[in-house]
From Swiss-Prot:
Segments forming domain HTH merR-type: 10-79
Role, per record: Involved in genotype-specific nodulation of soybeans.
Claim: Glycosyltransferase is one of the keywords in the record: no
A single GO molecular function term of this UniProt record: DNA binding
Record-level GO BP terms: nitrogen fixation
Assigned keywords, A-Z: DNA-binding, Nitrogen fixation, Nodulation
Protein name from the UniProt record: Nodulation protein NolA
DNA-binding region location: 13-32
Family matches, as SUPFAM superfamilies: Putative DNA-binding domain
Amino acid sequence: MSKATPRRRRWRIGELAEATGVTVRTLHHYEHTGLLAASERTDGGHRMYDRESVQRVHQIRALRELGFSLHEIRKAMEGTTSLIDLLRKHLERIELQVARATLLRDRLRDMTTGSEIQVSVDELPATLDAMSKVQTRSQTSRCTCKLAIEREERWRRIRDELRDCMDRGEHPCGERAKAVAVAARLLISEIAGADSRVSTILKVLARLSAPRSLAGWDP
């Protein structure tokens, strides 16, 4: 005598919401955007969902927590965009946001640190305007982020080359050491642009710390 095939587990929409940690309203929105579909309906018209639906909602939640839009998630799930491409593009956006936040942080530090600095209400409009310009540039120019990554890699190579010179005991006036110094100065000038404060800060650090305590850099 053969055994009856057990019926697969089904979830009503409220049960699915409870099982996945989202609201019923959110599930309705997922359905409206084409991300989720009921596996079947009861005779009374109630939506029913299967185990694949539960897994799909968990996948949507995971991608949402990474910051993806529902439109991007749908493209990835439909296969029109590969997940790795989606992750790379999102990484670029995150790096831009980090760069923007770093610039804003430095600006705020300039305004709030130091006993001689006094921040007045009159300065705030100009400060907010500067922040807005930084935000606009970050949002509209991805090449800025790529350039920053490329410069950071160049900086690491210069640092490693200099440390190798020091470990080998090469003379500071040797050809290799001079080439590293030239590369470092060129990169610093490229990063600083017309901002003379960078070279000023390096000179101050040179007076305050010995070269080796500056991770091998001797301005």
